[in-house]
Amino acid sequence: MSSLVTPINLDKINHSQSTVKDYILLMKPRVMSLVIFTGFVGIWLAPYSVHPFIAGIAVVCIALGAGSAGAINMWYDRDIDSLMKRTQKRPIVRGAIEPDEALSFGLITGFFAVFFMALCVNLLASFLLLFTIFYYICIYTIWLKRRSIQNIVIGGVSGALPPVIGYAAVSNTISLESIILFLIIFIWTPPHSWALALFCNDDYKNCKVPMMPAVKGNLYTKKQILIYSILLFIVSLMPFFIGMNNFIYLITSGILGLVFLYYSGSLFYDTPDNKQAKRFFAYSIFYLFFIFLLLSSTSTISLIS
């Protein structure tokens, strides 16, 4: 059953005093936490020595870069955020931060993130960070999100790059290992996002964002989730087969992947309240965190020293 969402008139908002918490929320802290963690794992797995201070600078720059992209995304999407139930409490929509302030904050934060990555770490990591911010804002947010059913698939490049940036921050190179880290997140993103779209379908229809369930229907979306889940299972085992991680990783990641497949299959038997989609979405977050925790704890290559 569709739930009516009352749109918020952005022109009639009574703007309040901004707080530090508002600016933290502007940077999408939940997304940022995943970016920081996967970026750190990329740093950890690079088979080179790096001073902890440099590693710390790299993590901070990755975090600020993600926050910058999140802030500019909220600035651009403030119109559709006002139409969606799950985004109506975002800082710009509720009047805690002016749109122009959010844009300025995002641009300045992004500039310093890229600048200090170049100054203190290396140019490759800085370029990758700049590319990630640009891709998320221009390719995903501005171009794809409102136009293409493949918005999440193609746009997922930006979300998959943090471990590559972290790896490059230490090694000053892009290797097979970092590409596999990229692929794990890249293939994980569509089923994760489409599960969210299944139980937020009314929101996306209301603001005319062409998410797959709204355009192709739930059954087609569930089939796509299953296909990507199978691909993810295969790719997640690759670190063992290239000698990147040990046998413990193979067994544990295999079990986690089978559970992921179970949840994706359970979507075909979901109830009208989308209980299975919500469970799958929650598990997908746990899955990615745990896979990257495994990648760092069962590595057979050098660590930070």
Swiss-Prot record:
GO terms for biological process: heme O biosynthetic process. The gene is ctaB. This is Protoheme IX farnesyltransferase. The lineage of its organism: Bacteria, Pseudomonadati, Pseudomonadota, Alphaproteobacteria, Rickettsiales. Gene3D superfamilies: UbiA prenyltransferase. It is an enzyme of class 2 (transferase). GO terms for molecular function: protoheme IX farnesyltransferase activity. Pathway: Porphyrin-containing compound metabolism; heme O biosynthesis; heme O from protoheme: step 1/1. The chain crosses the membrane at residues 31-51, 52-72, 102-119, 123-145, 151-171, 179-199, 225-245, 247-267, 284-304. Belongs to the UbiA prenyltransferase family. Protoheme IX farnesyltransferase subfamily. It catalyses: heme b + (2E,6E)-farnesyl diphosphate + H2O = Fe(II)-heme o + diphosphate. Its EC number is 2.5.1.141. It is found in: Cell inner membrane. NCBIfam families: cyoE_ctaB, PRK04375.1-2. GO terms for cellular component: plasma membrane. Carbon 2 of the heme B porphyrin ring is defined according to the Fischer nomenclature. It comes from the Bacteria. It is a multi-pass membrane protein. InterPro entries: Protohaem_IX_farnesylTrfase, UbiA_prenyltransferase, UbiA_prenylTrfase_CS, UbiA_sf. Keywords: Cell inner membrane, Cell membrane, Heme biosynthesis, Membrane, Transferase, Transmembrane, Transmembrane helix. Converts heme B (protoheme IX) to heme O by substitution of the vinyl group on carbon 2 of heme B porphyrin ring with a hydroxyethyl farnesyl side group.
